[in-house]
Swiss-Prot record:
Keywords: Ribonucleoprotein, Ribosomal protein, RNA-binding, rRNA-binding. GO terms for molecular function: rRNA binding; structural constituent of ribosome. Located on the platform of the 30S subunit, it bridges several disparate RNA helices of the 16S rRNA. Forms part of the Shine-Dalgarno cleft in the 70S ribosome. GO terms for cellular component: ribonucleoprotein complex; ribosome. This is Small ribosomal subunit protein uS11. The gene is rpsK. Gene3D superfamilies: Ribosomal protein S11 (3.30.420.80). Disulfide bonds: none annotated. GO terms for biological process: translation. InterPro entries: Ribosomal_uS11, Ribosomal_uS11_bac-type, Ribosomal_uS11_CS, Ribosomal_uS11_sf.
Length: 132
């Protein structure tokens, strides 16, 4: 006979830390947009993607999908008391501009916008051009 697990009753309350300003990392590829909001040390507070927001296939790579993902990540990070955001954008995708606008619309003060797209000094051979 299985014993029932006894509930101790005293549960530890989860401590939420307050972070004044953080960094929003926007990774905008051609297929998807990933937004991660971190503190100054790089510890992730919240994240969201276009695919995780319910968009599938070619709709994942639209500016509207990036906007919805940025709103989801921004609203999830509000629990930490975030006020100021520094935005670092990486990649050539269509969600670059709209995700910044959506984070601004969430009520954050954007202090700095930086493009951190990696540029090769003639590194790997790029993929071949599409023939449609």
């Amino acid at each position: 006979m299985a014993k029932s697990k006894k509930d101790s009753g005293a549960r530890r309350k989860k401590v939420t830390r307050t972070v004044a300003d953080g960094i929003a990392h926007v990774h905008a590829s051609f297929n998807n947009t990933i937004i991660t909001i971190t503190d100054r040390q790089g510890n992730a507070l919240s994240w969201a993607t276009s695919g995780g927001a319910g968009f599938r296939g070619s709709r994942k790579s639209t500016p509207f999908a990036a906007q919805v993902a940025a709103e989801n990540a921004g609203n999830a990070a509000k629990d930490y008391g975030l006020k100021n955001l520094e935005v670092r954008v990486k990649g050539p995708g269509p969600g670059r501009e709209s995700s910044i606008r959506a984070l601004n619309g969430c009520g954050y003060k954007i202090t700095h916008i930086e493009d951190v797209t990696p540029i090769p000094h003639n590194g790997c051979r790029p993929p071949k051009k599409r023939r449609v």
